[in-house]
Amino acid sequence: MTIFSTISSMSNVSSSSKSKISLMANSNGGQSLNNISCGGCGGSSSGGIVYTGPSGRSYTLPELIAVGVAHTKAFLMGASGSGNCSC
């Protein structure tokens, strides 16, 4: 199972083949706080969005994928509102 199919299986997450993953969240200046592409001002490859984990450590999407699909799924399920745009 790929990370995209795992994420797509969650009811509040949508994904595309370009790794643009959006969690439902309030927007800030037109940029979704939990959109990996950060409103087009960045991208997963450039760290356009950062998620803060339960331990306080910050993760980019590639880092979340690197730590494993199971951990990523559990993390994303509880990550609503924790992303921050850094453009």
Curated annotation (Swiss-Prot):
Q: Which InterPro entries match?
A: HssA/B-like_chaperone, HssA/B-related
Tell me the superkingdom of the source.
Eukaryota
Sections of the chain in a coiled coil: none
Pfam families linked: Coiled
Q: Name one GO biological process term.
A: sorocarp development
Q: Which family does it belong to?
A: Belongs to the hssA/B family.
PANTHER family per record = HSSA/B-LIKE PROTEIN 1-RELATED-RELATED, HSSA_B-LIKE PROTEIN 1-RELATED
Q: What is this protein called?
A: HssA/B-like protein 31
Protein's organism: Dictyostelium discoideum (Social amoeba)
